[in-house]
Amino acid sequence: MSKLSIRDLDLAHKHVFMRVDFNVPLSEDGSEITDDTRIRETLPTIEYALRHKAKLILASHLGRPKGKVNPKYSLRPVVDRLRTLLDHDVTSRVNVAFSPDCVGDVAKELSLQLESGQVLLLENLRFHAEEEANDPEFARKLASLCEIYVNDAFGSAHRAHASTEGITHFVKQSAAGLLMEKELEYLGKALEAPAKPFVAIIGGAKVSDKIKVIDNLLNKVDALLIGGGMAYTFLKSQGQDVGKSLVEADKLDIAKAALDKAKEKGVRFLLPVDHILADKFAADAATQTFEGTGAFPAEWMALDIGPKSIELFTKEIAAADTIVWNGPMGVFEMPAFAKGTTAVAQAVADNVDAVSIIGGGDSVAAVKQAGVADKIKHISTGGGASLEFLEGKKLPGVEALTEK
C-alpha cells in the first residue's frame, strides 16, 4: 500500500485522532447496542495504538441526525461496550472517557487530560452539519485535538467529510489504520493483480446500482455470475419474456452493452438458466421452478435462482482462485427464496484455496447465516465504499492519507 500506515508512525505520548466506524445498530430507545461487529472490527487498531502508548481520541458518526443534536443517536452507549471489549486481555482496566461534544472547550479540555494508553470517545460527529459539509473550520477544530490522524473507517472512506478528508489538511501525518489497510490490500489486489481465474458474483435487485461495478470488473475477471432481480433486466435485453419479474425497462440498452462487452473481452457472462417463480411477492407465495429461454407464465415473477443455476455457479466458483461477491441471488430475506444465496455462500466458503472477498449487507448476512463467515478470507466492512472501490473510483478518505 502506498499510503502511510499506523505501523509507520511513532505514537508514543502523542494525541492520536482516530476516525472509526461505530455506526452500530441500537435498540429503539437508543440505549442498547444490538450488534457490536463494527466496534470489534476496529479493536486491533485501537489496541495497537494503546500498546504503543498513544493518547487516543476516537471519533465516529452514528445514524443520520441531520446536523442536530439528537439523544437517540448518541455514542454514549458505546463507552461501556468499548470498555468491556478492551478489558479482555489488558491487565489494568482501560480508561475510556466520553466527551459530550466532538469540538469546543469541553472536548479540548478532556483531550488535554488524556494520559498515554487512555481513550477519549467524542460524541457523534454528525450532530454538527459541518461534518458532512466538509467545512474547513470544523475540520480545523477536529485537527486541533491531535498531532496524528488515523483513518480506520473504511465504510466512510467514499465520503469527503470533515473527519475523513478535511481534517487531513490540518495535520502533518495522516495514516491508515489496520482495518483500512486490510480492506485496501484485499480489494486493491483483487483489482490490480488477482490470482486467476478471477470470478465475480454480482447480485441484487437493480442493474442501475451495480452497472459501474460490472463495467469495471469486465476488464479484470474471467467469469461474471449474475443473480438477483438484476438478472431479469439482462435476460429481457436478450429477448426473453420474464413475466412479472423485476425489469428496469430504461436499462435494457446498458444491460445489452455489458453483454456485448463481455463477449468482446472473452469473459464468461453467466445468467441464471432456471428460476424459482412466485405468483406474488410474498413469503407464502405459490412457487414453481422454470427453466429454459421461453416465456415465463404471464403473472409470475422470479424471486430466486433455480437448482441448475446453483449447480452452474457452484462449478465456476469451485474453479476460481479469486472470488469477489456482492449482492444476493434472490429475495434472501424470505426463506422460500434464500436457497440460491445460501448455496453461493456455501460454494464460496468451500473453495478454501481461493482469495474470497465479500461485500454488501445481504451477502455478508448470508455467509453468517450459513455459518461459514470464518471460511471467507475477507468480509468487507464498507458497503458503499467497497462498491465505489470496485467501480474503480478513488475514495476521498483514502486519497487524503499521507503517501509513504
UniProtKB/Swiss-Prot annotation:
Protein name (database record) = Phosphoglycerate kinase
Mind giving the lineage of the organism this protein is from?
Bacteria, Pseudomonadati, Acidobacteriota, Terriglobia, Terriglobales
Q: Which HAMAP family match?
A: Phosphoglyc_kinase
Q: Which residues bind ATP?
A: K210, E333, G360, G361, D362, S363
Principal localization? Answer: cytoplasm
**Reaction(s) catalysed (UniProt annotation):** (2R)-3-phosphoglycerate + ATP = (2R)-3-phospho-glyceroyl phosphate + ADP
Q: Which family does it belong to?
A: Belongs to the phosphoglycerate kinase family.
Q: Which Pfam families match?
A: PGK
Q: Does the keyword Transferase apply?
A: yes
Enzyme Commission number = 2.7.2.3
Swiss-Prot/TrEMBL keywords: ATP-binding, Cytoplasm, Glycolysis, Kinase, Nucleotide-binding, Transferase
**PROSITE patterns recorded:** PGLYCERATE_KINASE (PS00111)
- Any one of the GO BP annotations: glycolytic process
Q: How does it assemble?
A: Monomer.
One CC-aspect GO term? cytosol
**Which biological pathway?**
Carbohydrate degradation; glycolysis; pyruvate from D-glyceraldehyde 3-phosphate: step 2/5
**GO terms for MF:** ADP binding; ATP binding; phosphoglycerate kinase activity
Record-listed substrate binding positions:
D21, F22, N23, R38, H61, L62, G63, R64, R126, R159
SUPFAM superfamilies assigned: Phosphoglycerate kinase
